[in-house]
Amino acid sequence: GKNYQACCPFHTEKSPSFSVSPDKQFYHCFGCGEHGNAISFLMEFDRLEFPDAIEELASFYSMDVPREQTHQTPAQLKQQHQAYQQKQNDYELMANISRFFQQQLKVASDKQVAIDYLKGRGLSGQIAKNFGIGYISDQWDGMMKVFGQSAETRQQLIDLGMAIQGERNQPYDRFRGRIMFPIHDKRGRVIGFGGRVLGDGTPKYLNSPETRIYHKGQELYGLFEAKQANKQLQQLVVVEGYMEVV
């Protein structure tokens, strides 16, 4: 037929009652009554505000969201587009790095010390997965070997605070021998990391610096995860560290 059927993502069911109509551009669940279009779906399912849902849809199709006319010159418009594209590349790279850290928690030769620490703090594998928690071994360039293959990407890693420029123009990993906590913005994009050292090293916690996509004063660790768990979030309890949030 013209419509797609699936189990509803908004309530638990065994028989598909969720219908999507490409022609009419809306969805409807005959079980719970949820109804809307692509924008309202993102707002409900991903817990996004209206402007963020618009931005998310636009980025999916590699489109710029039109802004209020400000009489910009062609050069200014070009610069604005380049800045937008750069940030999209940044988000993609940070997401890949986050997946790499999560994989290292499963395959690194010294993974057990990280797993034992997390278990000792009462975290199950599912909780670690829900928060995207990962691990990076205590190596000089464990992450750089994977992602720093080109001069352009090496500079991008430095700009994003994932690498530090060393002597003889050789960047090295900022985070080494640490449990890694990805920091998400309100749209769920990875914008930075917090790393908890294993052992007696210092500092105990190492955080991403300010970058073009990460502004510490504007972000709250765990807010995205909290909104995913409860779309009618009424209040928050502010605690000190990453582990306390988890």
Give, region by region, the residue ranges found by the protein language model:
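Non-catalytic accessory segments of DNA primases and related replication-initiation nucleases
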Residues: 1-155, 159, 208
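Phosphate-handling DNA/RNA-contact segment within nucleic-acid enzymes
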Residues: 75-97, 116, 137-246
